[in-house]
Amino acid sequence: MANSTFSGPIRSESTLKTVSKNATTGAITEVTTLGDGPVSLSDGDVTLTNATHSGRVLLVPDGSQDNTYTLPAPIAGSVFRFVYAGGAADATDAIIVTPGNTNFYIRGVSFHDSDNAISSVFSDGNSNSSIQINVPQAFDVTIIGKDSTNYQIFGSVTSATAPAFADQ
């Protein structure tokens, strides 16, 4: 694959994909897709992939049960943006987990309590690999692959119950 340098805009009739190449094996891994429409996640547990989900808005439904969304192994530059798409406050939780205990979240989210209090909720930065968004009324949470171990997380959650970071 050749390298190209562009001095003007790049146009695509469909999407643009960013990839990473393993320096040892030469294997190509798709990191993110730019330009595709949003992905409506199913009402159930979902294992995400970079090829299908990274770089796109992920619409989280008003679940009929607590749903767990499992991220793929972190790749620097991968981006997962979760947006609550329910039409009313949800009576269940959205849980977003990394693929394992060695992949954890750094930073946190702003919590907008529906009783008018505003605060921030932070991961511990060294082992929290799960965020539980409790009975949301709204949320917009972005998770970015920081490197091959960690995810950076930020965004906002509106609910009567604070979101919670935890170890898996």
Task: Give residue spans per PLM region.
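Long, leucine- and charge-enriched amphipathic alpha-helices
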Residues: 2-3, 11
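Structured beta-strand segments within beta-sheet-rich domains
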Residues: 118-139
